[in-house]
Amino acid sequence: MESQASENGSQTSSGVTDDYSSWYIEEPLGAEEVQPEGVNPLCQPTVPPALHHACLASLSLLALLLLALLVRRRRLWPHCAHCRPGLPSPVDFLAGNRSWTVPTAVFVALFSNLCLLLPDENPLPFLNRTAASSPDGEPETSRGPWKLLALLYYPALYYPLAACATAGHRAAYLLGTVLSWVHVSVQVWQRAECPQDPKIYKHYSLLASLPLLLSLGFLSLWYPVQVVQSIRHRTGAGSQGLQTSYSEKYLRALLCPKKLDSCSHPASKRSLLSRAWAFSQHSIYTPEPGFCLPLKLVISATLTGTATYQVALLLLVSVVPTVQKVRAGITTDVSYLLAGFGIVLSEDRQEVVELVKHHLWAVEACYISALVLSCSLTFLLLIRSLRTHRANLKALHRGAALDLGPPLQSTHPSRQAIVCWMSFSAYQTAFSCLGLLVQQVIFFLGTTILAFLVFVPLLHGRNLLLLRSLESTWPFWLTLVLAVILQNIAANWVFLESHHGYPELTNRRMLCVATFLLFPINMLVGAIMAIWRVLLSSLYNTVHLGQMDLSLLPQRAASLDPGYHTYRNFLRIEASQSHPGVIAFCALLLHVPSPQPQPPLAPQDSLRPAAEEEGMQLLQTKDLMAKGAGPKGSRSRARWGLAYTLLHNPSLQAFRKAALTSAKANGTQP
């Protein structure tokens, strides 16, 4: 019996053990963890990113040293450092004859890499930093200092890639080909090996790297083309004639303007299509022959478009997939959750589920609509601002004074102006990012309020809060509307009278009586107008937050707006240091043979006062008589504009012979 009992006990214990072991069959074994549903496991590439970046950094440093041997510092120290290597310039911002494609592509690649730093745990990939964990399991070290170092690392990484284009040497183009191919190969390899990333969204890393891949792909094609062209032409100095092509085109377009076709056809005889085209030309930016935007403005516009894409992508993938998952996981338990807050949508639980899903779908639709509206407004204002930039630069080139707030004290470069010019593109990109973010928040709140107070209640026939509030307060609103309508009718028919075709104030006694009696009601109307003023100004400033060519403050306080202040000083440097007319005349002077010695003339380094006054009258942009003077008047104004520019341009005044200590006026030597 004892043996049988022990046998039964062993069987029972083993059976219980078997039963208990079956309970933990789904539990993780050892240190393994179960990935949540819908989350992809972290990709482990065959070649770690640390090795990729170590190779890229070494190759970039080697390329920079080779470029330093090619580029000599003859411009700074022509005698004492004739054979010493110098640091090549990555971008020549003030040269209007340079191609804008390579600097723009490099800046897009740099900005895209900085955007990819946002979800990255290792900002510096070649430093595999494992953060020490605290007893609570949280990392003790912060990634902030490493991300600050990454902000300096990536510009240094792409520095040689941009400098190879400015060197203008066949070996530099070949070096740029190798660098661009290595960069694009590393990026394509990483995206092909790990197309999905569990951070933020599985496809976010791939979608955010599209501008990076496009810019590097363009550079990998541009540099080989330059190598082939340099081998075919067998010369590297043949670009000197091309350097002044833009300046010559500018002078031709300025001195020989073509008659517009719209002037020969009256406005009444033009078709609807031509009117629409003329309106689009006046409202948005269209290329104009003979004028090119400065390189900084082109880079800023491209970075604004890239920033809009990156911010919109981040806003989209960080919210919409989460809302979709929440909507798909709603069950009947949500009715109990809402009942706990005192919200009873329906007695039927299944109907509550459908209503909640429909409301979440409405929230998602409002969010996407607000994002589309924000991106559309950003692009439209960007195109419009390019036209404003061109108009302001053309006016400054011809010596006109712009209504850009308080007048500048001097047109000469200053410390503040140089700092503003250096930071213009960076400010424009940051303003665009923040402006799109603020627009998204404001538009999302507005569309959500409109949807849940108007459209959703009307569709479902319940929760008509807005209509109920209007039903209870309709006497108040009717009184205000009638007061405004009656005042307008009385102002038009009672208090105004025409005498000999001129309106004149009449019935002054009745006017004073009506003003006194309607004072309380007008005070209520004023409160409504004050709320409308706040909303309108907030909406206006939100829409134009990304524009630096427009002050968000009144004209008297325009200098307090940091963005507008930066824009004014940027125009000041661009108009004085990279004037195409000045560049063209300097190029002509360099190519003109030295003249025969002439007898010394009377000192004269400027126009006669009467002649300069006559020229300034021609330069007045608001003179209607000068505008209607025809082609001869426009040609005269253009010539006087060039003369005024060559006399007063700050980049030339310091180098004219009258300003030198060892020379007399008009170039006469002692």
Swiss-Prot record:
Glycosylation positions in this chain: N8
* Compartmental location: Cell membrane
The residues on the Cytoplasmic side of the membrane are 72-98, 166-168, 227-296, 390-423, 496-510, 549-670
Q: Which UniProt keywords apply?
A: Cell membrane, Glycoprotein, Membrane, Phosphoprotein, Receptor, Retinol-binding, Transmembrane, Transmembrane helix, Transport, Vitamin A
Q: Where is this region: Interaction with RBP1?
A: 235-294
The UniProt transmembrane annotation reads: 51-71, 99-119, 145-165, 169-189, 206-226, 297-317, 369-389, 424-444, 475-495
- Keyword Transmembrane helix (UniProt): yes
Molecular function via GO: retinal binding; retinol binding; retinol transmembrane transporter activity; signaling receptor activity
Describe the function of this protein. Functions as a retinol transporter. Accepts all-trans retinol from the extracellular retinol-binding protein RBP4, facilitates retinol transport across the cell membrane, and then transfers retinol to the cytoplasmic retinol-binding protein RBP1. Retinol uptake is enhanced by LRAT, an enzyme that converts retinol to all-trans retinyl esters, the storage forms of vitamin A.
Intramembrane residue numbers: 511-548
The annotated subunit structure for this chain is: Homodimer. Interacts with JAK2 and STAT5. Interacts (via extracellular domains) with RBP4. Interacts (via cytoplasmic domains) with RBP1.
Which top-level group of life is the source organism from? Answer: Eukaryota
- What are the Phosphotyrosine sites (modified residues) in this protein? Y644
The protein, known as: Receptor for retinol uptake STRA6
Q: Main subcellular localization, coarse class?
A: membrane
